[in-house]
Amino acid sequence: MKIGVFVPIGNNGWLISTHAPQYMPTFELNKAIVQKAEHYHFDFALSMIKLRGFGGKTEFWDHNLESFTLMAGLAAVTSKIQIYATAATLTLPPAIVARMASTIDSISGGRFGVNLVTGWQKPEYDQMGMWPGDDYFASRYDYLTEYVQVLRDLWGTGRSDFKGDYFTMNDCRVSPRPSQPMKVICAGQSDAGMAFSAQHADYNFCFGKGVNTPTAFAPTAARMMQAAEKTGRDVGSYVLFMVIADETDEAARAKWEHYKAGADEEALAWLTEQSQKDTRSGSDTNVRQMADPTSAVNINMGTLVGSYASVARMLDEVASVPGTDGVLLTFDDFLAGIDAFGERIQPLMRCRDHIAPVTREVA
């Protein structure tokens, strides 16, 4: 099972809590995180894109770096780890994304891929006059289908004459082309999102579910496998989890309860409000899971809370779920968390026993 890190491109990472570590996103922080991840043989690093935050006492995600420029910088200071940036497709023409991706492919020596998102938070785009109207919720995967067709044309042949409802290419050119086939990943959990991933993506991200229920996402992975069977393609699932680990189960649980007790209710109310704007995509979208009150303090990603041994055991359970190709990890404290993962958790994982033990780098 592959291991990735979901780098904190926005302030405070993924904990919407006054009790969680409070920090701003910087290149130096993300550089340290990804270089540590590479040192411990993580397979990939991904950054999201967020153009407007949730506010509240913690100003959650009100402060964000930009994904492609961040990952270009990280590509230049790493040598092995795969690097993925996220394209907010409403804001960037596909021909520009194709050229940016080809550039970072050159910087990274063929280690780059692109995560495509349709956009779900209207204020992110409305603030720039770029929201196409609420009918977009129902047509966004039609838009994305044309978008990825243009990308594949340009990456594959260097030229596109695509004509569609959303994009018109007139002998559009991109050169140099990527040195390797460009990986495309998506994060669809709705039926439309999974159908898109089955047709066009190499991997599909999904949320883990619950606290210490590592296989609860299995029905989602099964749906992705079923969708891929219809297209005759192999599209594995990468599952999002937060790791909160310590020497003992009790110590880790105490940290988790402390974070929950400091939940930023104002920021969470904003998330809930935005999740209700899309009435077209069904009840199984990513944003609706994010806003579920069960564990909204970390946007309801699957949460693994326990001793290093307990977390290792639960990650092995994740790996046992059919259709699972990897996990995308966040941490309550990224720098300490990655060190603990590399030194204390990964060596105990059966699914990572091919990785030689690594000790902490000397600064």
From Swiss-Prot:
Pfam families: Bac_luciferase. GO terms for biological process: alkanesulfonate catabolic process; nitrogen utilization; uracil catabolic process. The FMN-N(5)-oxide reacts spontaneously with NADH to produce FMN. Requires the flavin reductase RutF to regenerate FMN in vivo. The keyword Flavoprotein applies. Belongs to the NtaA/SnaA/DszA monooxygenase family. RutA subfamily. The gene is rutA. It catalyses: uracil + FMNH2 + NADH + O2 = (Z)-3-ureidoacrylate + FMN + NAD(+) + H2O + H(+); thymine + FMNH2 + NADH + O2 = (Z)-2-methylureidoacrylate + FMN + NAD(+) + H2O + H(+). It comes from Klebsiella variicola (strain At-22). GO terms for molecular function: alkanesulfonate monooxygenase activity; uracil oxygenase activity. Keywords: Flavoprotein, FMN, Monooxygenase, NADP, Oxidoreductase. This is Pyrimidine monooxygenase RutA. FMN binds at residues 49-50, 115, 124, 140-141, 190. InterPro entries: Luciferase-like_dom, Luciferase-like_sf, Pyrimidine_monooxygenase_RutA, SsuD_RutA_monooxygenase. The keyword Manganese does not apply. Its EC number is 1.14.99.46.
